[in-house]
Amino acid sequence: MRGNFIPREYDIFTGLDVSKKSISVTFTNHQGFIRSLNMPHKAEPLLNYVRKHFPDQKIAFVYEAGPTGYGLYDGLAAQAYPCLIAAPSMIPRAPGQRVKTNRLDSKALSENLRGGQLKSIHIPSATYRQLRHLTQLRDVLVSELAGMKQRIKSLLLFEGIEFPPAPAGSQWSFLVKDKLRKLACSGTVRFKLDQLLDSLEFNEKQVLKTITEIRRFCRNDPELSQCMKYLMSLPGIGWITASQLLARIGDWRELKNIRQLAGFLGLVPTEHSTGERVDRGSITRTGDERLRSKLIQGSWSAIRQDGELREFFRSVCRKHPREVASRVAIVAVARKLSVRISVVLMKQRPYEVREKVHSAPLTQEETSPRERLDDEQNREGKTPDGSTLETEIPGLCALKRGAFRVSVTAVCRATNSSKSLFGREVKES
């Protein structure tokens, strides 16, 4: 269902608790409860019942997102019935409720729909659903491939057999696998290793077939092909990340503003503010974890290609303690990259560098994970750049294992600053 749901425009509100074989249905109207019943998990019996008992009345439906997918939604939408699919985490729950049944769940959905307390998730079109199936299959196969490689290495380690030496990036080349098949092993170990190698080669073929199918599918669809070109014009975005983004975002026309995608990916900070006091914490981590991980991986590539993003990365690093600086900064870059993704999709044009920013290449120290301050630095109270804290911020105690002994608020009072050392805004009420 597109647009906002307005309860006063409908007469009957139908809550559906959908399971594998049946549907628990509850009907309510503006006056209250009407009836509850069970029926088979098909759209036809539900439609026949509605036409028979509620003729000439405007009816709305809602059910929870889950493993049953969009089949019921498609059946209702085909007959022009509005249907919402609500995210389970966004459905109001009574804190004192101790009884849960299908009938009570469908009744709660119906009442919440009547009260206008539910919002539908984004429902992708058939094209984007097919692309999502392909990208999910690739993720599963790649995960299985990594597990198979780990099982082979674990077997060799357990048996005290050295893995054949190979250059970085070529550990699983044809030559290495050929050496593994020729290793001197006992009978059962040899059999197990051969079976694992056969499974490894089969998984590799499955991954290649899936990748080929994703490329073919995107190439044959004009809209997907165009959007892929726009996304791949961004630094740090390759065809794998681009296809994953399109599969999860769906129709780009549903994007309302350039910040919505960052919220969808869980790259915006949590916030607990009251009055004039603003307190922001870590990112929300909502949405697809795999897609967020891919975007962060792409951000590492982006800061090597784009001078503006590289300088932004460095500026964020300077605001945070040494042991977390690079991790916090790369997440900030990923959020900035998500805004660029939204822009190229909403404006349907490739990314163009506004002004080339001259920036020194990244060093190994900047990109590698930073360890905690050692004991000597803790005693001396050194900052990430090596200077002492007492000379820069009056009244500040020394660091102890990366944590300040005095509160951030006290530091801000001492320096009359509106920002803490962690880059968060702190305002006193």
Predicted features along the sequence, with ranges:
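Gly/Thr-rich phosphate-binding beta-strand-loop-beta motif of the actin/hexokinase/Hsp70
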Residues: 5-28, 109
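Short glycine-rich, Thr/Ser-proximal phosphate-binding strand/loop in the N-terminal lobe
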Residues: 22-45
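Short, basic/hydrophobic alpha-helical segments
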Residues: 43-60
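Short alpha-helix plus adjacent loop in nuclease-associated cores
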Residues: 84-122, 129-133, 176, 277-286
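Glycine-rich, often acidic, oxyanion-interacting loops/wings at catalytic, nucleic-acid
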Residues: 136-230
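Phosphate-backbone recognition surface of nucleic-acid-processing proteins
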Residues: 229-240, 244-326
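Low-complexity, acidic/Ser/Thr- and charged residue-rich accessory regions of DNA metabolism proteins
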Residues: 276, 313-429
